[in-house]
A protein has these predicted regions:
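Phosphate-group recognition and catalysis centered on beta-loop-alpha active-site segments
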Residues: 1-253
Length: 253
């Protein structure tokens, strides 16, 4: 089950980032903790499989250079500066060690298959090992992914860690290369019981999706992403029990 903090403390989207504070950086996560918010972050593998906290597959947008995150060693990631600041790409273990249970941390495993298929490599198991150690200490942690195979991998390796599905309409234009039938099944959340999920984080503009409502009626915690204004928050909270946000400051739980 999700720790209660996941339902009471709004989750910063990639930390509390802004001017001079890059997303998914230690500075963004420290700011979130200081303001009483929770944290949502993204995980990609380093060349040796170490879970790194980084959203994109390529380095261009945040590091200003060519290359892919999965080609970096942890040391190279730690020497890669983000958006011209002194902030570098952190490891998941370092972030969780810094937070130390002071805020709920929702870890999103990025797809490694390319089509939300089973080729996730060792990343789910590596994430599970790190997160399970925190969970065993009573720290509020959970893991989710758009890829149900990633969620299932964490569940198999760490059965006590809460897992969820990141979800949306899975529109064709946003999810090219995934067959229509599979996209439809994903939008209907058909994998939810199979993978042993205990929550979802759904796109805020699709909270009226009937499968979302059915899960909510069953008492399944519905979170949502990504809220960018008080008006969007007010609309989302008609269904969602908590939000992932950026660009404004909601009331901290």
């Amino acid at each position: 089950m999700l720790h209660p903090d996941f339902l009471t403390r709004p989750l910063t989207h990639r930390g509390l980032h802004g001017l001079g504070v890059p997303e998914n950086s230690m500075a963004a996560f420290r700011a979130a903790v200081a303001q009483g918010y929770g944290i949502e972050l993204d995980v990609q593998p380093a060349a040796d499989g170490t879970p790194l906290v980084f959203h994109d597959y390529g380095l261009g947008r945040l590091a200003g250079r060519d290359g892919v995150i999965s080609a970096l060693s942890p040391a190279e990631a730690g020497a890669t500066r983000l958006l011209g600041t002194n902030e570098a790409i952190p490891t998941l273990e370092a972030v969780l060690g810094m937070v130390a249970g002071r805020a709920p941390v929702l870890v999103e495993i990025k797809d490694q298959d390319g089509s939300l298929g089973p080729r996730m490599g060792a990343l789910p198991g590596r994430v599970a090992e790190i997160v399970a150690a925190c969970h065993a200490q009573g720290e509020p942690v959970a893991v989710m992914s758009f890829n149900p195979h990633a969620a299932a991998g964490v569940r198999a390796a760490a059965p006590d860690v809460p897992i969820g599905l990141t979800s949306c309409r899975f529109d064709r234009d946003d999810w090219t290369g995934i067959p229509e039938a599979r996209r439809a099944a994903l939008s209907r959340l058909e994998d939810f019981p199979r993978v042993g999920a205990s929550f979802i984080s759904h796109h805020h503009q699709d909270l009226g999706n009937p499968p979302v409502g059915r899960l909510a009626a069953q008492g399944v915690p519905v979170l949502c992403w990504t809220i960018r204004s008080p008006a969007e928050e007010a609309a989302a909270r008609g269904v969602a029990r908590n939000i992932t946000f950026e660009g404004y400051r909601p009331q901290a739980g």
